[in-house]
């Protein structure tokens, strides 16, 4: 399971790469994580700008305009990859390596961003999760 310092590293690397970018499209390859991804809620972030990323305990909190928050827990093996406009793939933590063939089958959610960039949620064991909340209800749902 990613320890707290690793989650902080992921937050910092993602903040640097995706802050102020807009979600153009979301592709769900497999919604069967620890909790199923709510497809109706994930569609609501399309067209929204990512304003900031925070960490609370081992949760990553992605704050979008329109007061929507995407809460992510990496579980045991969850990770993010960032692909820039030159199609260069970056990892967001130092605990794993990039292996395009091996990684591809575990890319569960792909967020297509403006400027032809992508954010990929990858989780081999599927113990992580992605949930959505209104900003005002967020802290009632953290446990």
Positions of predicted regions on the chain:
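Structured interface patches
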Residues: 31-40
